[in-house]
From Swiss-Prot:
GO terms for cellular component: cytoplasm. InterPro entries: Arg_repress, Arg_repress_C, Arg_repress_C_sf, Arg_repress_DNA-bd, WH-like_DNA-bd_sf, WH_DNA-bd_sf. SUPFAM superfamilies: C-terminal domain of arginine repressor, Winged helix' DNA-binding domain. The keyword Isomerase does not apply. One of its GO terms (biological process) is protein complex oligomerization. It comes from Chlamydia pneumoniae. Its main location: cytoplasm. The keyword Cytoplasm applies. Keywords: Amino-acid biosynthesis, Arginine biosynthesis, Cytoplasm, DNA-binding, Repressor, Transcription, Transcription regulation. Regulates arginine biosynthesis genes. This is Arginine repressor. NCBIfam families: argR_whole (TIGR01529).
Amino acid sequence: MKKKVTIDEALKEILRLEGAATQEELCAKLLAQGFATTQSSVSRWLRKIQAVKVAGERGARYSLPSSTEKTTTRHLVLSIRHNASLIVIRTVPGSASWIAALLDQGLKDEILGTLAGDDTIFVTPIDEGRLPLLMVSIANLLQVFLD
């Protein structure tokens, strides 16, 4: 008996094999595989599987993070601290912009904005009351442990 493919598996396979520039393009590719879905649902699935939009030869495209990318982020983040309204992430020199881009893509519904220098990122949450939860989301996305 053939195993039924889930939409998560189909989406991961599309991203692995061909990628996509837009969520609408992903909707069309999923529809071609028999999954009728909406852009907002695709957006949620992309967050769930931690897909990010990366620049490449064919322009910016959605992609799955590799296991080495997750391992790399763990070694690039030196600390994550916060006050009542702002999260500050210290990184090794030269990596703040790359990590800020991961945060912007992976947590765009929780983050109002990021500002990255060479080794420091300021993260402003959409809702200050949810700042502790955002700290956990950031730690999970970057595969780091909080102090």
